[in-house]
Amino acid sequence: MSKISDLNYSQHITLADNFKQKSEVLNTWRVGMNDFARIAGGQDNRRNILSPGAFLEFLAKIFTLGYVDFSKRSNEAGRNMMAHIKSSSYSKDTNGNEKMKFYMNNPVGERADSPKVIIEISLSTITTMGTRQGHTAIIFPQPDGSTNRYEGKSFERKDESSLHLITNKVLACYQSEANKKIARLLNNNQELNNLQKLNNLQKLNNLLKLNNIQGLNNPQELNNPQNLNDSQELNNSQELNSPQELNDPQELNNSQDLNNSKVSCTVSVDSTITGLLKEPLNNALLAIRNEHLLLMPHVCDESISYLLGEKGILEEIDKLYALNDHGIDNDKVGNNEINDIKVNLSHILIDSLDDAKVNLTPVIDSILETFSKSPYINDVRILDWCFNKSMQYFDDTKKIKHACSVINHINLRSDQSKIAETLFFNLDKEPYKNSPELQGLIWNKLVVYVNEFNLSNREKTNLIQRLFDNVESIFNEVPVSILVNDIFMNDFFMKNPEMINWYFPQLLKSYEGEKIYFDNLKYDLNDNDKESNKEILKNQPDNVIKEKLNNEYKLRFRMMQTILQSRVNVLPYINEQRLNKLNPPENLRIAIEHFGWKNRPITA
């Protein structure tokens, strides 16, 4: 690792925005870089970053990985340097190229009057090779408005993570180290409070002993046979081992304090939490609001209400809107960009909650309510997390209610098959499989996307059959809306004779049930406008007859579609005798006789 004095500064002079005399440029350049390196200085300089170039190499490494272990001694200087970052800004141009700038104060000294040092990290859009190029630089603004720019090491990313998300993950690694100190302080405070409680209990015990003795000195008390039963306690030498405590006047004055000991301990805990957690929380809220970054404070059971309650972190994330000074316009593009940022910040949030293994009972309802709307509900990871938490914290009734809410809120598109896959995976378990309401929603809103899944035709048909089996197990009769679902008309299904041989009998059975209803009414399905039909309709409940007519038509039409598109022989399921008994409308009869019967034997 090169020292500052070994760097060839002259190679960077041409990168300055404005030129000055060579000697003046070199002097300001040296001072700026030496001050910057001194930020990372420590008692053991051999283990610290000794140049801006080395720091940029460190940044290139961690932005390539998207992760850094700041607890390692080798990363001590990087942690020390990042501690001096005061603010940041993020921008994205119309081509998708991203830029993150971190602003650092110059250390107190020769450069105290200089503007902030700027660390710049840029990341291009994905290239045709699937790799994005990133770059690092340090910019030293000068008092006269000129800048000296030090170009650092480049890096590559082969995933689609935004620079904003990568930055948040790196900062989360940094913040986790700072949170360890908070955790130690809270733990020490808890131990102190436990000791205080123990001392208070001891004092209370001593006062009780004293009260017992005073009671014996009271003649009226001595006449109480119940009190005389306490003589065994008085004969216990261990109980009277502390005469000094019993005679201590200070102990006699502590009865009121002892009565309030539980309250005082609670106040002590709360005040410590307020001191250690409220300020980091406020800083986090400001960072979310102003910089769209999440420096997640320490998470523990005691802090959950502070972090995720009213005016907490998730509420602040949800309130974000497109800001022009972040390079995001207030239009459709800006809304998409800010939605991506909301999702990125939510990923950091749920990671922190999972790592802390905290009890979310006080806030789980509000969290899932927020995540049940856009843009969070359209993110696979957040959706999966919500279902896992629902399984963990809710009873069966609330689990089903949450699942129904999710399905009703999702506005699925053909490019969201991953969301549908996530839903199917989570809903293929108890208690969801036994809910008629939920199964109806699944078929009405989700099943249509099965054809978009990255599955083989066999896997798709197996999934459909499994879902259908769930329906058969909970409904007395399979709803017509499920039987005529459009998923059955896809090629992966219609061109599979095995599936048609399973499907057509289901349609036929349901249609026969509807046809019997109309036969009993003597309703002629070949001519709906017949006068006799009109008279029948007058004597039937309007909603019932309309539903029945609709079901009959849908089933009849679907049977005709299935026969014509699949070209499967339906003779094993409906022969001439059964067809005559069914006596369907003419169009269905023609479809069966002319297109559905293959290799029909000729009879005399």
Curated annotation (Swiss-Prot):
Record-given protein name: Uncharacterized protein YjgL
Recorded name of the encoding gene: yjgL
Superkingdom classification of source: Bacteria
Ranges for region Disordered: 239-259
